[in-house]
Curated annotation (Swiss-Prot):
Domain of life, source organism: Eukaryota
Family (UniProt): Belongs to the INKA family.
Entries under InterPro entries matching the protein: FAM212, Inka
Function noted in UniProt: Inhibitor of the serine/threonine-protein kinase pak4/pak5. Acts by binding pak4/pak5 in a substrate-like manner, inhibiting the protein kinase activity.
Record protein name field: PAK4-inhibitor inka2
Keyword Transferase on entry: no
Gene Ontology molecular functions: protein kinase binding; protein serine/threonine kinase inhibitor activity
Region (Disordered): 43-74, 108-130
Annotated Gene3D superfamilies: Phosphorylase Kinase, domain 1
Biased composition (Acidic residues): 119-129
Amino acid sequence: MHKSHLDSVAPQLRSDLQCIKASSSSLCDQMECMLRVLQDFKRSSPPPSPDIEKPCVVPPRRAPRRDNRISHRTSDLSEADSACCMDLPSDVSPGSCGQRGLEWDSGYSEVSGGSLRGEEDDIVEEESETSVPTVVLRRLPTPSCQRLSSGGFLNSRQGRIRPKSTSDVCLEQWRGIGLGSDSQDWTGCLLSQSRSRQPLVLGDNSFADLVKQWMDLPENVDEEGRRVRDGGRWLHKPHGFLISLSGNVKRRLGNMSRLRRSEQEAVKRMSCPQLGCRPLSLYYHQSLSDIAEASTNLLHCRSRQPIICNEGAGFL
């Protein structure tokens, strides 16, 4: 039985194998045909141009010229800062940039703010092909005595007025207050100007505030000489300070004492005495001695207010 079944399947398998061989041969023919087409396409295409094969060369970018920027910065620094100078190379004549020379003044200028080092880092040097001389900015070490002694305007070489520093302005302002103290009341100077630039607020301790602000004021030349001579004096202040108080301070002291007196008088006066501050109680609980003390206290009372007893009014 199995043999008969295998005999029936064998021709079917042969036919399948023949079909597979035929399909494989057709696939081989198709592959050969495709290879021929590709070779023909290569032969028919034009040869590649030599320009395409070369890589694209990007031209180098040159740094922008910064002559104007350097000149603007040096001019701004000459007007803003007062403790700088310019250091030029040896091949550059000093006449070209000499007019931009920066002169010193006393103190620390608010406009400069110590920004020279940051600006030096920002300046990019140009290439050697341009041959443009670079300007190097450096700060001159100014002696402390020169910085502290100068107090006026310093004129530059071009005749322009130099800006004052904050220390010079404050020094001149307080010197003017100290010199004009003879003609002007010092309390007016305190109320209008103070070292902290803050309005003077007078509170409960207004006298202490005035004294503290007065101690901060600069002294006159005569007072400074007296302070040097009398070095052991308490706080180096004149002896007649407490005696020569202005009328303004005296008026404020009088107002303070008057307010305290009015607060004391604001306490309500009782028409009858407090009977020795004894606690209030009913009348029939008190003894005869307490009633006698109450009558004596009423006799010594100076009030003229009516006392109503048994529906009858009378005055002591």
